[in-house]
Amino acid sequence: MASITGHCVAHFTDLSTRKSSFFSNSNNNSSLFRRKSTNIVTRKKYIFCSTSLSMNGCNGDPRAPVGTIETRTLPAVSTPALAMERLSSAVANLKSTLPSAQSGIIRLEVPIEEHIEALDWLHSQDQKNLLPRCYFSGRSQVTFSDFTSNDLTNRNGSAANGHLQRISTSSDDKNLVSVAGVGSAVLFRSPNPFSFDDWLSIKRFLSKNCPLIRAYGAIRFDARPHIAPEWKAFGSFYFVVPQVEFDELHGSSMIAATVAWDNALSLTYQQAIVALQTTMEQVSSTVSKLRQDVSHTSLVSKANIPDRTSWDLTLNRVLEEIGNKYSPLTKVVLARRSQVITTSDIDPLAWLSSFKADGKDAYQFCLQPHEAPAFIGNTPEQLFGRDQLTVFSEALAATRARGESDSLDLQMAHDLFSSPKDNHEFAIVRENIRQKLDAICTSVETEPMKSVRKLKRIQHLYARFAGRLRSEDDEFKILSSLHPTPAVCGFPMEDARKFIAENEMFDRGLYAGPVGFFGGAQSDFSVGIRSALIGKDAGALIYAGLGVVEGSDPALEWQELELKASQFMKLMKLEAPALK
C-alpha cells in the first residue's frame, strides 16, 4: 500500500436528462445525435451534467493537494466472481472507516490467477447502462519503446515487430496488456481547450507510487467554440479514472475498484463509497468470450462528406495554395467522414475485437461517456510515450497497400521508399517532430534511417525518436507541442489548421486527436486516426484522412481514403449499393 500527499480535486454531481438519437439527418453540417442537455455554470466554468454521482476534477484548485493517494493489493483469487466478492468486502470495510483526509483516491485491487481478456470482460457488462466505459490496449501489447543511441544505430525495426521492450517500475504495470473500465471515480471534462491547469487537475490524482491509477481519455483535434452535437458529450477533452477496472496481464488478470472524494466539492467520502457500491452491484462476474467473427450488421447506405466532387475541388485548392510562392503551406491533411446506415445497431466492442484479430500492430481504444456514442479506433501511430523523464515519439507518414504476395509486397514497399512525393511528405513530418522535441528536451535521439512500417493491410514510412525532459511539467509541453503533428494537420501547423477549419465541412471531434492515458510515472498517447463514432439507431461515422503535398493526385488520394476506411467497411455486409 502506498500513501502520499498529493493535490486537491474538484468534484461535481452530474444529473443529466439527455436522450441520444443517432442520425437525425445527413446533410453536410448534420448533427448525428439530438438530445436535450442540462448545463449549469459553476465558478465561472461551464459544467456538463450526467446521471451518475461523480466529480469533475477540472473544477477545483489544480494546485491544491489531494489528501491521500493509495493502492491496496488484496490476496489473489482464482476467478472474477471471487475477486468481486473480495472487493465488495473491502469496500464495505472502507465505508466503516472514515479517513482523516478531506480528499483522496484509493484503489483496491485483487489479482486473478486466470488470464482473461479485458475486452471480453467489458463486453460481458451491461452495455447500455454501465457507463461511462473505456478500453485501451497498447500496440503489440507494448506501450513504451525502450531504445538508446546504440539501439537506434543497430536496429531497423519497429515496436510492432517486437524489437523494443517496455520499461516500467511496477511488475503489474510491466505485464499490463490492456485495460477496461466502467463508471467514473473522477472525470475531467470541459468545453474549453485543454490547458496546463487541466493537466494539473488530472495529475493531482496520480502518483508514481500508484502506477495503475490512471486517467484514460482523449482530446479533440482542434478546440472550437461550437462543438457538433455528436461530439458534445466529450467536450474539448474527456478523461476518466474508472470506478471498476479490469486489467489484462500476461498470464493473469486483475480487478480493481477505485473511490475518489473531495469534501470541498460536495462529494464526501461516504457518498463516493455509495456511488462505487452502486456501480459494483451492476458488474457481472460472468465473462463470455467475445466472438471475433463480427458482425451480423449489413450496410444499407454510405454517404461521404465531402463527396468525390467536393473532394477533388478541395484537394486542388490545397495544391494551388502549395504552389503559390506567397503561401507558406507545404502540406495540408484533408479528412473525410463517411456516414453509414446499417440494418441493426453496431456493437463497438465487437468491431474492436475484429481489429485485435486482424492485426496487433496498433493501439485499440474505446471511450464512451454516459448517454453518448462510442469513439473507437485502431490506430498504428503513437503521439508520445513517457516513462519518468524519458519521452518517445515517432514519425509515420505516406501510405501503400500491402502486396498479395511477398514479391509484390516488397515491390510496393520499394515504391513507397523511393517515391519523391512520399519521401517529401515523410520528411516534413519527421523534421517537424524532431524540432519540437529539440525545443523541449535536454537531448534527443533520432533514428538515422527511415524504415517501412508494415501493418495488416497497409504500410508507411516510419522513424523513431527518444528525448529527455527537464521536468515532469514538460509532459504538458510535449503534448501541446506535438499535437497536431504534420501527419494529421499539415505544415506549417497554424496555416494548415486554418485551412482545415475554413474548408472542412464537418467537425473532426476526437478524430486525429490524442487518445491514451496519463499516469503517475508513465503516460502513453496514440493519434486517434483510423477511428469511428458509433451510436444508437443503427449507424456510425467513419473517419479517414491523408496528407496533400506537391504532386498529390486527387484520384489516387481518394483511393487511399477508401483503403484506410476499409478496416471498418469490411465488417459490414452490403445490403444496398453504397452512396458515393
Curated annotation (Swiss-Prot):
The keyword Transcription does not apply. Transmembrane segments: none annotated. One of its GO terms (molecular function) is isochorismate synthase activity. It is found in: Plastid, Chloroplast. GO terms for cellular component: chloroplast. It catalyses: chorismate = isochorismate. Not inhibited by Tyr, Phe or Trp. Its EC number is 5.4.4.2. Keywords: Chloroplast, Isomerase, Magnesium, Plant defense, Plastid, Transit peptide. The keyword Cell membrane does not apply. Optimum pH is 7.0-9.0. Its cofactor is Mg(2+). One of its GO terms (biological process) is phylloquinone biosynthetic process. Induction: Up-regulated by fungal elicitor. Disulfide bonds: none annotated. Residues 1-91 form a transit peptide. Belongs to the isochorismate synthase family. PANTHER family: ISOCHORISMATE SYNTHASE 2, CHLOROPLASTIC, PTHR47253. Two isoforms can be purified from cell cultures, but they are probably encoded by a single gene and may arise by post-transcriptional modifications. This is Isochorismate synthase, chloroplastic. It comes from Catharanthus roseus (Madagascar periwinkle).
